[in-house]
Amino acid sequence: MYQPDFPPVPLRLGLYPVVDSVAWIECLLAAGVRTIQLRIKDKRDAEVEADVVAAITLGRRYDARLFVNDYWRLAIKHQAYGVHLGQEDLKTTDLNAIRTAGLRLGVSTHDDMEIDIALAARPSYIALGHVFPTQTKQMPSAPQGLEQLARHIERLADYPTVAIGGISLKRAPAVLATGVGSIAVVSAITQAADWRAATAQLLAIAGVGDE
């Protein structure tokens, strides 16, 4: 059995929106979301520090699991709940500093080789994607689909996992049926005609996660 070498997270993190602004963080936490990620890309630390601080403050106010994507130094400095890193970030990040600071770590993966790399770091959770085609970001790999996702879940057994990539309200039940512990969503909420209704429906399907 694989054991994380970072502080643990619940096996089921529930609905896990990934958003690029503090405004979305505040709206979704107020709507009942309890696991969320701030993902701001391609800016210097100084440019995003105020947003990171505001997001972490909101996370504490709502007793939520607030992950910061990429900006691990700021996450440590301001004591976020956790950090999420991509495969390339793993090579340049001081993982021991994150661990010593008591922050949780999530790592993105796209195939078996990247899962091996993630497992070597023994993070708090492993993200598996992209499950379906996605317009949110350019992806060099092909979508994995539900069968491949289910195979990864079987391999990872009781390790906390998150599925990401093209997960819509309609697709969410089938994704969760693979046994994955959480679904990360972006456009299913941010591009919904009624984001409040979409969030409520997704929460009803995926839950808020375990305590």
From Swiss-Prot:
Please tell me where Mg(2+) binds in this chain.
D70, D89
Q: Which UniProt keywords apply?
A: Magnesium, Metal-binding, Thiamine biosynthesis, Transferase
Q: Which CDD domains match?
A: TMP_TenI
Record-listed 2-[(2R,5Z)-2-carboxy-4-methylthiazol-5(2H)-ylidene]ethyl phosphate binding positions? T134, Q135, T136, G166, V186, S187
Q: What is its EC number?
A: 2.5.1.3
Q: Name one GO molecular function term.
A: thiamine-phosphate diphosphorylase activity
Residues involved in 4-amino-2-methyl-5-(diphosphooxymethyl)pyrimidine binding: Q37, L38, R39, I40, K41, N69, S108, K137
Q: Which GO terms describe its cellular component?
A: cytoplasm
Reaction catalysed?
2-[(2R,5Z)-2-carboxy-4-methylthiazol-5(2H)-ylidene]ethyl phosphate + 4-amino-2-methyl-5-(diphosphooxymethyl)pyrimidine + 2 H(+) = thiamine phosphate + CO2 + diphosphate; 2-(2-carboxy-4-methylthiazol-5-yl)ethyl phosphate + 4-amino-2-methyl-5-(diphosphooxymethyl)pyrimidine + 2 H(+) = thiamine phosphate + CO2 + diphosphate; 4-methyl-5-(2-phosphooxyethyl)-thiazole + 4-amino-2-methyl-5-(diphosphooxymethyl)pyrimidine + H(+) = thiamine phosphate + diphosphate
Q: Which cofactor does it need?
A: Mg(2+)
Which pathway does the record list?
Cofactor biosynthesis; thiamine diphosphate biosynthesis; thiamine phosphate from 4-amino-2-methyl-5-diphosphomethylpyrimidine and 4-methyl-5-(2-phosphoethyl)-thiazole: step 1/1
Q: Which SUPFAM superfamilies match?
A: Thiamin phosphate synthase
Cofactor: binding details: Binds 1 Mg(2+) ion per subunit.
Q: Which GO terms describe its biological process?
A: thiamine biosynthetic process; thiamine diphosphate biosynthetic process
Give the function comment from the record.
Answer: Condenses 4-methyl-5-(beta-hydroxyethyl)thiazole monophosphate (THZ-P) and 2-methyl-4-amino-5-hydroxymethyl pyrimidine pyrophosphate (HMP-PP) to form thiamine monophosphate (TMP).
For this chain, the family text in UniProt reads: Belongs to the thiamine-phosphate synthase family.
- Put simply, this protein is called Thiamine-phosphate synthase
Q: Which organism is it from?
A: Salmonella arizonae (strain ATCC BAA-731 / CDC346-86 / RSK2980)
